[in-house]
């Protein structure tokens, strides 16, 4: 919830709290609201936040509507409206939002990579929400799933229409490959822009019976590598 309490009494507005250049602030702002809308729970937003208002709220003045003359603010307002439409038209984002079976973490363990991903599930639908909170891109980042699937991009916060940094043609349809870790036998590989987020609609497919074997072999190979490196380190210390 980002209410009026967050934008008064010297606390600065939401966009003005954020680090970086003008463009970096806008990128973070898009990802912040992506997180709010894609995470379970009801949404609360205070007027002005939806266009990246820089001046704190003043009950004696109207909003600075002139901001919409500037491309970043105009694009962000359009992004916010689109984000709201996505939320209202994708049942998995609101159906069963307090049911733990409708939410599943996919990536949340590596603070150094700064990538967080989770599944939202509802009414037979599966959506994969992905955030890159770092100021650099990740190329071919692996996400491990329990089922094989195709993936279609629904929303990308770095799309040019929202003022994002992505340029040219890009791949918006993805597919899992066999092999994974931690009992998740399938891998979805994706390019993640700096401080960007994306929403993918998943289409599950029939499981490959060889996928579990491939994952087990990869896990065993990793254990052997760790064992060899540990043994080498032990010998070198003698």
Where are the language model's segments positioned?
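Aromatic-lined glycan-binding groove of carbohydrate-active enzymes
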Residues: 1-16, 39
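Carbohydrate-interacting/catalytic domains
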Residues: 22-26, 30, 35-45, 49-238
């Amino acid at each position: 919830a980002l209410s009026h309490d967050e934008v008064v009494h010297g606390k600065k507005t939401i966009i003005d709290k954020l680090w970086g250049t003008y463009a970096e602030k806008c990128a973070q702002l898009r990802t912040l609201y992506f997180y709010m809308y894609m995470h379970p729970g009801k949404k609360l937003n205070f007027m002005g936040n939806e266009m990246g208002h820089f001046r704190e709220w003043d009950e004696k003045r109207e909003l600075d509507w002139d901001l919409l003359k500037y491309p970043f603010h105009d694009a962000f307002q359009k992004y916010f409206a689109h984000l709201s439409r996505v939320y209202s038209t994708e049942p998995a984002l609101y159906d069963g939002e307090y049911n733990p079976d409708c939410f599943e973490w996919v990536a949340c363990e590596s603070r150094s990579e700064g990538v967080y991903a989770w599944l939202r599930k509802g009414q037979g639908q599966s959506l994969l929400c992905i955030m890159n909170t770092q100021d650099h891109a990740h190329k071919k980042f692996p996400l491990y799933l329990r089922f094989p699937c195709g993936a279609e991009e629904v929303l990308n916060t770095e799309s040019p229409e929202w003022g994002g940094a992505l340029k040219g043609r890009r791949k918006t349809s993805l597919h899992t490959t066999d092999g994974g870790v931690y009992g998740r036998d399938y891998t979805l590989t994706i390019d993640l822009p700096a401080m960007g987020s994306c929403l993918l609609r998943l289409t599950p497919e029939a499981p490959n019976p060889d996928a579990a074997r491939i994952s087990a072999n990869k896990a065993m190979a990793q254990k052997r590598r760790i064992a060899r490196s540990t043994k080498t380190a032990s010998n070198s210390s003698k």
